[in-house]
């Protein structure tokens, strides 16, 4: 969609030294336990074609971003596994003979050149940590992350934009929730049952300086458009 197109144009413009995907690279509806909550689950052979379609679709989406990273010659790539991604691992736990659906295998992370950070594991760059974001929630989840982790942390999961700062004896720290890039159309999110949401399309540009210090520039995308470094990026 347009938000992903904006991200790809930004990657080519920024020429980043590293790229971090914060996870939930797909909705993974076919693997969801919720899918069979109100109906009888059919035999496995009837489910597999849908699983295959999900894997194919998500890989195509990742190919689009990887193409931009390749063009920008981005040498370092990280993937922080999300809770939706982890549904694939849970499926393999239930069906151990279908190991090809384990998340990192299904999306070929190693072949794509990504370092894989399993769900809940944090990636550290300079004085900033990254992970999916599902461990601490609530209305003020950025404040909750700072309170529980006590470090600079950047995450996704909650789909909205928040920043909260705190100071400790060793200096100030912040938590950033940097939105999402998912399809926010009503028909793609029927599970919300028409609930109003505060989700936002966004990504972040992080610059690192000496001694692990860094600055964060959160770039919000509105209706498939944003402005970065004085340039309009239109993904429509």
For each feature predicted by the language model, list its residue ranges.
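Conserved beta-sheet core of the metallophosphoesterase superfamily
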Residues: 125-219
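A generic local structural motif
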Residues: 5-7, 64, 116-122, 138-143
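Core catalytic region of metal-dependent phosphoesterases/phosphodiesterases
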Residues: 1-110
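Short C-terminal domain-edge/linker segments immediately following a structured domain
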Residues: 18-25, 50-54, 108-113, 157-166, ...
């Amino acid at each position: 969609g347009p938000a992903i197109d904006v991200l790809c144009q930004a990657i080519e413009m920024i020429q980043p030294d590293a790229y971090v995907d914060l996870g939930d690279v797909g909705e993974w509806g076919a693997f969801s336990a919720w899918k069979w909550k109100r109906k009888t689950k059919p035999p496995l052979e009837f489910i597999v074609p849908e699983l295959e379609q999900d894997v194919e679709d998500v890989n195509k989406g990742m190919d689009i971003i990887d193409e931009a990273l390749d063009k920008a010659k981005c040498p370092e790539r990280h993937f922080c596994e999300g809770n939706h991604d982890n549904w694939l691992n849970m499926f393999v736990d239930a069906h151990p003979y279908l190991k090809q659906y384990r998340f990192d295998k299904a999306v070929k992370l190693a072949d794509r050149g990504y370092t894989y950070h399993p769900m809940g594991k944090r990636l550290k760059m300079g004085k900033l940590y990254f992970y999916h974001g599902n461990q601490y929630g609530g209305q003020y989840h950025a404040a909750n992350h700072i309170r529980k982790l006590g470090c600079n942390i950047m995450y996704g999961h909650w789909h909205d934009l928040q920043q909260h700062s705190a100071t400790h004896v060793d200096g100030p720290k912040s938590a950033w929730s940097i939105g999402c890039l998912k399809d926010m159309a009503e028909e793609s999110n029927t599970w919300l049952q028409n609930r109003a949401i505060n989700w936002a399309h966004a990504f972040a540009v992080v610059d690192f300086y000496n001694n692990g210090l860094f600055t964060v520039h959160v770039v919000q995308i509105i209706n498939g458009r944003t402005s970065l470094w004085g340039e309009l990026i239109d993904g429509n």
